[in-house]
Structures are given as C-alpha cells and as structure tokens.
C-alpha cells in the first residue's frame, strides 16, 4: 500500500498549474496510482519530472514522447478518461 505521505507529495507534484494537466494528473494519482506496480509508479514519478509544455503536447496528442515508456504512461492516463 502506498503511504499517505508519498500520495500527498505526489498529489502536490501532480498539480502543475495548467488546468489541462491538472484534470488528468490529479485524479490519476488519487484513483489509479495506489494500484500501480512498482515499475509503473517509478514511471509516473519520472513523468512528473518532464516539462509542462512537453506533457501538454503529449496529453493533447499533438506530439509523442521519444521515450516509449513515458508514452505508455501518457497513454495509460489518457485511456482512463477516454477509453479506446
């Protein structure tokens, strides 16, 4: 189980100040992150180190990350709100 301290920290790191990112990342960290395996948790934390403008392009599907694993996490987050 994910510790409350870790979830709170990730919650605040997921709040990017850009509404388009906040509406995707904040619910994901609250509802999905606790159920991810360790590899995907690490991947989500790595995603949070990316620049907001890069993430915006990926989530708006204007571009794809050159990192296939990061793109997989982007897809996982998008599939939560718009299943294919």
Curated annotation (Swiss-Prot):
Bridged cysteine pairs (disulfide): none
Domain of life: Bacteria
Keyword terms: Chaperone, Cytoplasm
Claim: Chaperone is one of the keywords in the record: yes
UniProt GO BP: succinate metabolic process
Cell compartment(s), UniProt: Cytoplasm
Family: Belongs to the SdhE FAD assembly factor family.
Descriptive protein name: FAD assembly factor SdhE
Native organism taxonomy: Bacteria, Pseudomonadati, Pseudomonadota, Gammaproteobacteria, Pseudomonadales
Primary gene name: sdhE
